[in-house]
């Protein structure tokens, strides 16, 4: 199903936003909405133009952190779009914007059903926009994980993984990220063995496409180390932590917080294994490295 009708011009508004001229962008978007409401067209054509103008206004309000206004604009746009087949694409985009707005403002439970609807809309387009739907399902899975609904989270992660792997190929960062997310889900749910398998899959992909010394590789190694400790393979866990820390130390200017967090986990493991001298030695090293950033 394709969109129809002549759209409200959005490029001037987007250009103003890109230039940081937010007040002018808001004024232009508001004027476009007033024009759409007052024009002579009637029925579906008028509603289409108002819907598009509301979408643009909502985007501007969101950029300006006018959260209440943005939500109201998106919801009014969705109400006008209704269930019209010719506005399926517009409806999908409005729902996506509304879902992410709610999600990023700590209203995850409100965002979840909107994500569900948006993903279904993108999948129903002709041709389907499966990749966007998969990205939305990944976000939705993160919400369900946070809400403790692990089975639902797994369902959406696996659907996301299947689509992204099919459309983008196995050797892509997007696929590696979903494997990492699934591993995190399994770990949180208490399935460390399964988590370890997922983390390893993500590591294999990241090493191949990013190289062995990339900071995302360090993230995978840290996750693997944590899972190894949980299953009792502490010696391997130490080695993975140490490799991750070498990578992060080389990139400490950009990854100081990650270096400190992983270093703390490494120290905790050393202390749990009664290797206090090694723990103390690394603590001093980490403090010295971090002090160079002050």
Where are the model-predicted features located?
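Inter-repeat boundary and helix-capping residues of tandem alpha-helical solenoids
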Residues: 2-3, 40-47, 88, 127-130, ...
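TPR/TPR-like (Sel1-like) alpha-helical repeat modules
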Residues: 235-246, 264-292
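Conserved alpha-helical positions within TPR/SEL1-like repeat arrays
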Residues: 10-18, 48-63, 89-104, 131-146, ...
């Amino acid at each position: 199903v394709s969109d129809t009708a002549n759209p409200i011009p959005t490029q001037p508004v987007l250009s103003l936003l890109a230039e940081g001229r937010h007040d002018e962008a808001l004024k232009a978007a508001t004027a476009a909405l007033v024009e759409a409401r007052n024009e002579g067209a009637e029925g579906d054509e008028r509603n289409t133009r108002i819907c598009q103008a509301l979408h643009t206004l909502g985007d501007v309000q969101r950029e300006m952190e006018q959260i209440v206004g943005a939500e109201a604009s998106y919801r009014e746009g969705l109400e006008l779009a209704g269930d019209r087949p010719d506005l399926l694409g517009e409806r999908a985009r409005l729902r996506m914007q509304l879902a992410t707005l709610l999600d990023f403002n700590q209203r995850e439970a409100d965002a979840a059903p909107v994500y569900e609807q948006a993903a279904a809309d993108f999948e129903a387009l002709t041709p389907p926009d499966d990749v966007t739907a998969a990205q939305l399902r990944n976000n939705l899975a993160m919400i369900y994980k946070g809400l403790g609904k692990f089975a639902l989270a797994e369902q959406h992660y696996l659907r996301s993984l299947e689509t992204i792997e099919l459309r983008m190929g196995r050797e892509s960062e997007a696929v590696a990220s979903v494997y990492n997310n699934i591993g995190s889900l399994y770990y949180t749910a208490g399935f460390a063995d399964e988590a370890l398998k997922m983390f390893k899959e993500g590591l294999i992909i990241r090493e191949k496409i990013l190289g062995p010394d990339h900071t995302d590789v360090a993230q995978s190694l840290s996750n693997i180390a944590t899972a190894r400790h949980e299953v009792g393979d502490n010696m391997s866990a130490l080695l993975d932590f140490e490799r991750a820390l070498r990578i992060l130390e080389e990139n400490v200017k950009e990854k100081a917080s990650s270096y400190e967090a992983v270093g703390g986990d490494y120290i905790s493991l050393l202390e749990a294994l009664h290797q206090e001298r090694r723990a103390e030695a690394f603590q001093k090293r980490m403090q010295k490295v971090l002090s160079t950033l002050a």
